[in-house]
Amino acid sequence: MKSVLIVYNQANNERVEYMLDELGIRGFTQWENVQGRGHINGDPHRGTHTWPEMNSAVLTIVDDDKVENLLRMVHKLDKRNSEVGIRAFVWNIEQMR
């Protein structure tokens, strides 16, 4: 099993949920109003007058065989509009109870 953290501009909220539904990924935890800045060339997302945009984040636990398709869809969404931004991070899950 893998843990996938997807961090994205709030403009992509509906697209990310649609992506999870399309892949049959039912369970997730979502955080709104996530602040941050991309590691290469991303602008800050702070919810302030200067930097008004905000991010959201979704954490889901999936079977190994769903990870590649999920990452492929995230990449496709990022290529669609790289200015908006979306990234996915994957970790191994040792145990789940």
Where are these regions (language model features)?
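Positively charged, small/polar-rich N-terminal and surface patches that mediate targeting and assembly
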Residues: 1-97
